[in-house]
């Protein structure tokens, strides 16, 4: 459609997600090119075997990042939500713009919840015995909306899902519009399970998905379900801190994380996260209440 047009300037957003062949086309059409993206968030989605993935996993943006400018002021997150990603991923350099540094749900007319009184809140499920399961073998087809005996390898956690659904209903009972809330599940099977539990809320505008679907997006409030809970400390691709950085930076005014510190706590990234929520006294236990809606 643009023929042989060459533009004075080409701006490519989310450039860290673009593999080289995709970037070469716009780069060839600009006298000057500006690449914008975050190398600490999701890279390109590449399929086709180990050789193809290894070839395309490193992007032009990654190779140019040493000659870049970091935008240190962010205009999305409350400072309590921002501080951990800033420390863990950006060397503590992020700064909250004055207009967002202290904004909270109450500014939107949402009733306060004294039991979750901070902009960031952790519900720790350690010791609840809400153990994860795999969907490799799903005899009822109940989690993936597929025929019985379907093969759909992913991880889900029914205990977590029930708690996350309760937390979502509690938030909505305070007057938060469903369109202002998102639930991000670490695994696709868990997202499907949550969609089943929250059908009515989804019909009203609540969004439920995985990390990949929320790159570059934001919501006033976000619940993140990290799903994994086992006796061996296995965390799978939760060890990919770039993915977790995306999940933890989508919320503007309120972020609630549901996680098992006993399973995740040996990984340095999560150990630092649990230390931070303890430092700011922003945590509760799944043992303490059932997250009933507020009257």
State each model region's role.
Residues 1-295:
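Conserved helicase motor core of SF1/SF2 NTP-dependent helicases
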């Amino acid at each position: 459609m643009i023929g042989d047009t060459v533009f004075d300037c080409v701006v490519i957003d989310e450039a860290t997600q673009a593999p080289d062949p995709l970037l070469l086309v716009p780069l060839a059409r600009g006298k000057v090119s500006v690449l914008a993206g975050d190398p600490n968030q999701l890279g390109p989605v590449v399929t086709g075997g180990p050789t193809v993935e290894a070839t395309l996993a490193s992007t032009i943006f990654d190779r140019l990042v040493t000659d870049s400018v970091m935008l240190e002021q962010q205009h999305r997150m409350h400072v309590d939500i921002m501080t951990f990603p800033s420390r863990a991923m950006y060397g503590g350099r992020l700064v909250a713009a004055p207009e967002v540094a202290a904004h909270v749900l109450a500014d939107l007319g949402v009733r306060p919840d004294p039991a979750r009184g901070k902009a960031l809140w952790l519900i720790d499920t350690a010791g609840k015995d809400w153990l994860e399961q795999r969907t490799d073998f799903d005899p009822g087809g109940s989690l993936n909306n597929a025929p019985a005996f379907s093969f759909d390898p992913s991880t889900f956690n029914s205990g977590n899902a029930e708690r996350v659904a309760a937390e979502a209903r509690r938030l909505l009972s305070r007057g938060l519009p469903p369109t202002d809330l998102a639930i991000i599940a670490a695994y696709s099977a868990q997202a499907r399970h949550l969609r089943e539990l929250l059908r009515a809320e989804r019909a009203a505008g609540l969004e439920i998905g995985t990390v990949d679907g929320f790159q570059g997006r934001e919501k006033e409030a976000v619940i993140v379900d990290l799903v994994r809970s086992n006796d061996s400390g296995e965390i799978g691709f939760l060890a990919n801190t770039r993915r977790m950085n995306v999940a933890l930076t989508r919320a503007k005014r309120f972020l609630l994380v549901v996680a098992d510190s006993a399973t995740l706590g040996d990984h340095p990234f999560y150990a630092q996260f649990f230390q931070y929520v303890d430092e700011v006294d922003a945590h509760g236990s799944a043992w303490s209440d059932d997250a009933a809606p507020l009257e």
